[in-house]
Amino acid sequence: MSSKAETPERSVSTSLDTNGQVCNGSEMIPFTLPGFDLARFVRATLDEDLGIGLPGGGRDVTSESVIPADMRFAGAMDSRDAITVAGLPIAAAFFRTLDPAMEIEVLIDEGAQVPAGTDLMRLSGNARAMLTAERSALNTVQHLSGIATLTRSYVDAMQSNSTLLDTRKTIPGLRHLEKYATRMGGAQNHRMGLWDAAMIKDNHVAVAGGVAEAVQRAKTAGVRSIICEVDRIDQIEAALSAGASHILLDNMNPGQLSQAVALIAGRVPSEASGGVRLGTIAAIAATGVTYVSVGRLTQSAPAADIGLDFTPL
């Protein structure tokens, strides 16, 4: 499973360089997600909002018609609820892309838990640029902080030594960001995609003719990491004997999970998955499983309530 990424530092002025990194003047602040191009994401998001390539598109008609070109704003972003923060450096990148001279101070560490009313970011710069970037920046930080906040709720509810995992149930195109947000909430990443581990599920088992046969096919193909999903206790030993390196226990109740953990006996990691809720995760984790995976972290997280207010300078 992937480890927690480095987080941007506190109280930094940020901008976006040509490599998609967040920077503070001449000092580079690491914000690199393998496989994710920050500069491309920011540009594509702004292009979508501005209607680049569409008839009549390519501009913010409201700001251009109402706000003087040389007007400057001060901006203040704050939390309206208690949240776990994720995505502030990405939000900052939207503003600096449109106004490279914008002064931005990120006040809170990524992954920090903050109460309602906490100042998150301060900005000073071109008013049109702020207004044009506002929605893209807020959408991103609200979405990612919402995921981080829900994830932290599940981590806190576990009350055990088990580790919370996310899943591949992410919005297309946003997987790297959403999985980053779950890490900021205290979870670890499950597979990033179809490429980094085999996960044998019921359809694979049906075609192969059984759990052992499916695992053996993956082993023969040279796959090193083989996660095998089982939904019955009597499938576990067959999966282990065939060489599974991780057993996923699908939709089992706590009694079945305890039995499965005893049978696996620490030979490989065990994972409980399926139908996990805040009210049930403590009992599930108490069975001794290594991991508990929850699709709702990225499927069902509500946006965090984060506001951004501007004042003319």
Task: Locate the predicted segments by residue.
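Glycine-centered small-residue hotspots that permit tight backbone geometry or close packing
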Residues: D17, G274-V276
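Intrinsic disorder/low-complexity segments
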Residues: M1-N24
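Acidic/glycine-rich phosphate/pyrophosphate-binding loops and surrounding catalytic core
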Residues: G25-A242, M252, S258-L263, P269-E271, ...
